[in-house]
């Protein structure tokens, strides 16, 4: 069963920026950003070595990890060149001006 949590206000999400939002009761932050025109939420840590993904870059629909340059496609979660690594995407719901995420 998913845990639905309020992550931020929609106005807090800036196109082209990576922002990690702390979530009460969860040990890692959640990144909410735009991939094309779609609002996307993913864990704030790299599945490779638990490095903060918000320290990386958002480039051409991918998050580039600052530690090793691993690139994660925001549409699929796949890591280029490392099929064993997958960045989970969380379902996003907009309620009024708030962004809610279903943590799986």
Which functions belong to the PLM regions below?
Residues 60-66, 80-88:
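Short cysteine/histidine-rich metal-coordination sites, predominantly Zn2+-binding motifs
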